């Protein structure tokens, strides 16, 4: 498999212990599908530009959509797995939404291994093929590490050697480091985290609240009208 994990401890140290969904003070009146307030805070125009300029982004919705929603996720976050089905339904039902995946491996060394494979696939395939991988790997159970991610990629027809070579490049390491640094700077201390229209939402609110957020951005250019 992947012979070595470069900067694993550095990546984890950048964020410290990360939680797989965490709640705290809310700046905007955003609620989850149970009616409970979601932890969130505002982001400046400069911070939004930092997110938009990240390397290694994967557009899986409409690339020219009228609303852009970023999802920062860790493949081993249980709430991210739960969110995957909702996010899939969201883009299937909204062809003008630009959904952007941001691999954000902050929970473990195994998450970093798997993210290396993901970022290699991003370079070697299309966004739709990446989405197919995303669906497939979340369809299984148990810990997702580099070996499991590689096995799923091979099932989808990717060349093992090319994946490993790409996954271990400095380019991929730099991408993960940048994601970790920006995520930490933006206080994305829970996974999944969503960034949209000047707001960061920590945790997964559910499908209908996400639809409401997107509708609000379309209507009044804000997450809450």
Report the location of each language-model feature.
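C-terminal cap of thioredoxin/glutaredoxin-like
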Residues: 2, 19-30, 151-225
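Bacterial N-terminal signal peptides
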Residues: 5-16
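A short, structure-level motif marking secondary-structure boundaries and short turns
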Residues: 44-45, 72-73, 133-135, 164-166
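Soluble non-cytosolic domains of exported or imported proteins
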Residues: 67, 78-81, 108-112, 124-128, ...
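Structural microenvironment flanking redox-active thiols in thiol-disulfide oxidoreductases
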Residues: 93-122, 127-153
């Amino acid at each position: 498999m992947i012979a070595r994990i470069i900067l694993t401890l550095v990546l984890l140290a950048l964020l410290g212990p990360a939680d797989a969904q965490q709640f705290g003070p809310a700046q905007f009146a955003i609620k989850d599908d149970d009616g409970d307030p979601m932890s969130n805070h505002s982001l400046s125009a400069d911070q939004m530009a930092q997110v938009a300029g990240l390397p290694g982004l994967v557009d899986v919705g409409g690339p020219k959509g009228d609303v852009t929603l970023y999802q920062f996720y860790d493949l081993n976050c249980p709430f991210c797995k739960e969110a995957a089905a909702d996010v899939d339904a969201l883009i299937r039902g909204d062809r003008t939404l630009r959904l952007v995946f941001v691999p954000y491996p902050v929970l473990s060394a195994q998450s970093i291994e798997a993210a290396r494979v993901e970022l290699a696939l991003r370079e070697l395939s299309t966004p739709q093929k990446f989405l197919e991988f995303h669906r497939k790997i979340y369809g299984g159970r148990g810990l997702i590490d580099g070996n499991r991610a590689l096995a799923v990629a091979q099932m989808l027809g990717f060349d093992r050697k090319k994946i490993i070579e790409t996954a271990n490049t400095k380019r991929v390491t730099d991408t993960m480091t940048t994601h970790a640094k920006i995520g930490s700077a933006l206080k994305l201390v829970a996974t999944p985290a969503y960034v949209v229209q000047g707001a960061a939402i920590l945790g997964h609110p559910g499908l209908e609240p996400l639809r409401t957020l997107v509708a609000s951005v379309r209507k009044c250019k804000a997450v809450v009208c």
